[in-house]
Amino acid sequence: MTTGLSTAGAQDIGRSSVRPYLEECTRRFQEMFDRHVVTRPTKVELTDAELREVIDDCNAAVAPLGKTVSDERWISYVGVVLWSQSPRHIKDMEAFKAVCVLNCVTFVWDDMDPALHDFGLFLPQLRKICEKYYGPEDAEVAYEAARAFVTSDHMFRDSPIKAALCTTSPEQYFRFRVTDIGVDFWMKMSYPIYRHPEFTEHAKTSLAARMTTRGLTIVNDFYSYDREVSLGQITNCFRLCDVSDETAFKEFFQARLDDMIEDIECIKAFDQLTQDVFLDLIYGNFVWTTSNKRYKTAVNDVNSRIQ
């Protein structure tokens, strides 16, 4: 990718790092999933032709923004979709490919310096993707969810609202992240994959997003903490504790594990297919995060700021 490594707001992550806790916390996440979810997610396998179609559509969508993205970076982005959907219930592979493309191109937007954002160029590309892969009604829902996500990402980059919600309490923080982490968008572009009436309604009302936000965000925040500190970003729940204080960190981490367990146990009240989709998303995101290059180092060629 044609990108430089941003140093704006960079901090000394040697003084503020979760690296000392990496092995123990990964073990505790895994034990929690083994105990409360049990069924390990499986990866959706795209054919070479399907992957090439996805990457070509991704390249076409971001080309108007003047950036070239490597296949390696696209494959890093698409991994979360391959691991976090529910392959045993997929009924529409065209909708699945739509999620692959929309996920990847909005990842680029999220990783991009906001000075490069151009709604007039990018939104028509999102609409084109939706109209290619979905029927008319679902295309409109997916497009509006995509538009809302990229608009929110742009408007909250340096917002006092974001600062207040991200630095006050876990409750305020997770309220903000329902939209900011993209899970509401995810659900509204994903429901056509399954053609399941109950899940469709939970996606459209945003209950699906609210049920899975903490399970996604806590994992994402732990493994992206060092990167986000290095870039001066505040959107991380572990900023709400002193990670250099081992006792304080462990208490905070346990509270967040308890949040995840509470949500997972409540998810078990939903119908079986909806349960599977929710839990495959939360658990699959953990599998992807712990195996993906994006989270291996604070800054590398698949997670660096696009400038």
Swiss-Prot record:
Its cofactor is Mg(2+). Changing W288G: Produces 3,7,18-dolabellatriene. Keywords: Isomerase, Lyase, Magnesium, Metal-binding. Mg(2+) 2 binds at D110. Transmembrane segments: none annotated. The keyword Manganese does not apply. Changing D113E: No change in product (cyclooctat-9-en-7-ol). A motif (NSE/DTE motif) lies at residues 220-228. Changing D110E: No change in product (cyclooctat-9-en-7-ol). A motif (DDXXD motif) lies at residues 110-113. The keyword Magnesium applies. GO terms for molecular function: isomerase activity; lyase activity; metal ion binding. Mg(2+) 3 binds at N220, S224, E228. It catalyses: geranylgeranyl diphosphate + H2O = cyclooctat-9-en-7-ol + diphosphate. 3,7,18-dolabellatriene produced by the Trp288Gly mutant has potential antibiotic activity against multidrug-resistant S.aureus (MRSA). This is Cyclooctat-9-en-7-ol synthase. The gene is CotB2.
